[in-house]
């Protein structure tokens, strides 16, 4: 057995931060008081008076629940769902957007970089904004003043934080923030706009967002910023790469410390509106697959950060991967609920990870609900690399994704020649299971950095304490290739002698017929009972287009992207991009109760809302999907498709 994460390592760099050495709640609370953790650590349970009826923010609300308390559409009548209306999104990239509905108006983005206001009951266009350029692809934010006189949509637009009047679509001219203005010294001359697909979050009168960061060695740190929504003034900033003297600074080399970057919250995050805590999952320190130049654990990379949403003060953290070499960043918004364990009610935050684990913490304190062990892992043989000797392994719940890929797992549905090439590959590469480091001869990573789960792919049912995860099975071959470009070496932060940069081309082991290398199922839908941590079901998520044409079912959609939404009607709505199907499942069993064939992929998150006493479900549709299989017909137009029960 491995050793608990709370023992044997510096509490400043391992496990759950300064709380790691505490075993009793009294000691834990004392440690919190000394180092700035939330005063609510020993307080009463939060009331959790969340509004699950509306859908006025990305993923439904700032709590990111992807849950609706509406139950007009339920397990009994869902089979009668029909298309109520659709709205064309225009030519261009497929929509990955999660619509919001506020004060009887739906807001969506279009392919030409505009925001459209729609009648949510009919899809009739009310207006289009004058915005041009790229807008955050996944979502936008709604804010209004206390008296409701000032109503704004806040979003990223070509690297600027912009706002438009939610009634008219006109720009608010005296509000604009260039994210480059917040870059630390040494990075302020970045010529390109800082743009991300992460929509950020509104909390009270602040807009919180992570600075974008590139994937190269010279990337700037993706600090987390908060801006006053009325004035655009910077109200606080949190350094994701700690500066000298800050907590976690010793997890980085002293040399070139100010030049290290990354640690980007590229996906999405959650704000608990009652506790006033922002739960922010972070990405990898740069570069993604080689860290010889950055010895140490590299806080706050690959961490769930609990920050005071009003001040930016760190309350607690947990690092899920030390010194990441696999691009195993945390890809989705943490989920909130209250569970009952050993007779006690615990308000938890739940984080699903790319490498297939589910991490569960008391969200007030950061204490793990189930033990997390530090276990020895394979070590790097790459020149100059300093891989971590151990990594955190949750002892419970069980993983939702496969974490190994061997010769026995080769896909039998790919050509024999491809199968033989894979067998030969296994004889030469490193393949020692999860956390096999990248190498010069190539290393298998399973699930790879595009496997496991991703943005928008988790949901909760807070009434039944269920947690849902959509995942995909995509092994990767990580091969380090020396990068001899002089400019790369010159710009590489170098925390040690004799270090040279390496490049790791993406190799998802896609085969000649367009299928992944691993045998089906290619994707799963997993449901957990969070009171016990047990898996309720783990079932294939959708179908493979190619195999379905051959009469083979139950293979799972290849690389679905976009998320589920649970409802009080006992349903789980989820689209599967590869087979172009939108389904309603029984949330308790996973059984398909209704499905609708679309003419294009679904890659966004559905929105569930009610207008005029009628419940609707809207899903963005467009494109052929990620890693589309060969032979599928050309996709239909980009659009938003809305379903409802027949009008009375």
Give the positions of each predicted feature.
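Extracytoplasmic/lumenal domain signature
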Residues: 76-90, 115-135, 147, 161-191, ...
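Repeat-blade elements of multi-bladed beta-propeller folds
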Residues: 55-59, 92-112, 134-160, 192-218, ...
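Beta-propeller domains
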Residues: 216-219, 243, 260-267, 316, ...
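Long, low-complexity segments enriched in small/aliphatic residues
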Residues: 391, 395-476, 484-485, 498, ...
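C-terminal motif of bacterial Sec signal peptides marking the signal peptidase cleavage site
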Residues: 28-31
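N-terminal pre-domain segments of enzymes
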Residues: 34-72, 388-419, 423
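Short, solvent-exposed loop/turn elements at domain surfaces
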Residues: 61-69, 92-96, 116, 288-289, ...
């Amino acid at each position: 057995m491995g050793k608990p994460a709370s023992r044997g390592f510096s509490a400043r760099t391992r496990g759950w931060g300064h709380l790691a050495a505490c075993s009793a709640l009294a000691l834990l609370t004392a440690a919190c008081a000394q180092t700035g953790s939330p005063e609510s650590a020993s307080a009463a349970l939060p009331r959790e008076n969340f509004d699950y009826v509306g859908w006025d923010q990305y993923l439904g609300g700032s709590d990111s629940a992807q849950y609706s308390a509406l139950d007009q559409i339920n397990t009994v009548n869902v089979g009668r769902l029909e298309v109520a209306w659709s709205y064309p999104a225009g030519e261009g990239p497929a929509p990955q957007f999660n619509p919001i509905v506020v004060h009887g108006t739906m807001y969506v983005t279009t392919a030409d970089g505009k925001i459209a206001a729609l009648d949510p009951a009919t899809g009739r266009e009310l207006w289009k904004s004058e915005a041009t350029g790229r807008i955050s692809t996944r979502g936008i934010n709604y804010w209004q003043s206390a008296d409701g006189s000032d109503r704004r949509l806040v979003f990223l637009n070509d690297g600027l934080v912009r706002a438009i009047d939610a009634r008219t679509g006109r720009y608010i001219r005296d509000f604009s923030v260039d994210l480059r203005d917040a870059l630390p010294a040494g990075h302020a001359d970045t010529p390109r706009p800082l743009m991300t697909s992460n929509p950020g979050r509104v909390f009270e009168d602040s807009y919180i967002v992570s600075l974008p960061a590139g994937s190269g060695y010279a990337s700037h740190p993706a600090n987390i910023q908060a801006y006053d929504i009325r004035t655009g003034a910077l109200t606080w900033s949190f350094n994701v790469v700690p500066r000298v003297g800050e907590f976690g600074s010793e997890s980085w080399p002293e040399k070139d410390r100010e030049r290290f970057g990354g640690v980007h919250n590229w996906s999405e995050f959650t704000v608990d509106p009652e506790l006033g805590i922002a739960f922010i999952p972070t990405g990898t320190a740069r570069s993604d697959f080689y860290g010889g130049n950055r010895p140490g654990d590299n806080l706050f990379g690959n961490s769930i950060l609990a920050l005071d949403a009003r001040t930016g003060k760190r309350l607690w953290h947990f690092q899920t991967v030390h010194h990441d070499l696999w691009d195993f960043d945390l890809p989705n918004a943490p989920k909130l609920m209250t569970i009952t364990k050993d007779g006690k009610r615990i308000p938890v935050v739940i984080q699903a990870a790319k490498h297939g684990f589910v991490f569960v913490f008391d969200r007030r304190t950061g204490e793990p609900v189930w033990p997390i062990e530090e276990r020895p892992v394979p070590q790097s043989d790459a020149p100059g690399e300093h891989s971590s000797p151990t990594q955190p392994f949750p002892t419970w719940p069980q993983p939702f994704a496969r974490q190994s890929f061997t010769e026995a797992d080769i896909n039998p549905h790919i050509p024999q020649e491809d199968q033989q090439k894979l067998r030969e590959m296994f004889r030469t590469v490193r393949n020692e299971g999860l956390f096999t480091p990248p190498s010069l001869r190539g290393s298998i990573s399973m699930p790879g950095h595009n496997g496991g789960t991703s943005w928008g792919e988790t949901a909760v049912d807070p009434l039944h304490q269920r947690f849902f995860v959509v995942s995909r099975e995509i092994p990767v071959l990580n091969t380090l290739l020396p990068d001899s470009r002089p400019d790369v070496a010159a710009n590489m932060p170098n925390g040690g002698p004799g270090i040279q940069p390496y490049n790791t081309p993406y190799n998802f082991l896609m085969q000649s017929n367009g299928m992944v290398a691993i045998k089906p199922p290619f994707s799963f839908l997993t449901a957990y009972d969070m009171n016990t941590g047990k898996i309720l079901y783990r079932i294939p998520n959708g179908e493979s287009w190619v195999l379905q044409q051959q009469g083979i079912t139950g293979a799972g959609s290849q690389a679905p992207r976009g998320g589920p939404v649970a409802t009080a009607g006992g349903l789980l709505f989820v689209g599967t991009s590869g087979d172009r199907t939108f389904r309603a499942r029984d949330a308790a069993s996973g059984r398909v109760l209704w499905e609708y064939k679309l003419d294009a992929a679904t890659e966004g998150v559905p929105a569930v809302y009610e207008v005029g006493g009628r419940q609707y479900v809207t899903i963005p549709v467009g494109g052929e999907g990620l890693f589309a299989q060969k032979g599928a017909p050309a996709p239909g137009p980009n659009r938003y498709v809305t379903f409802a029960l027949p009008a009375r």
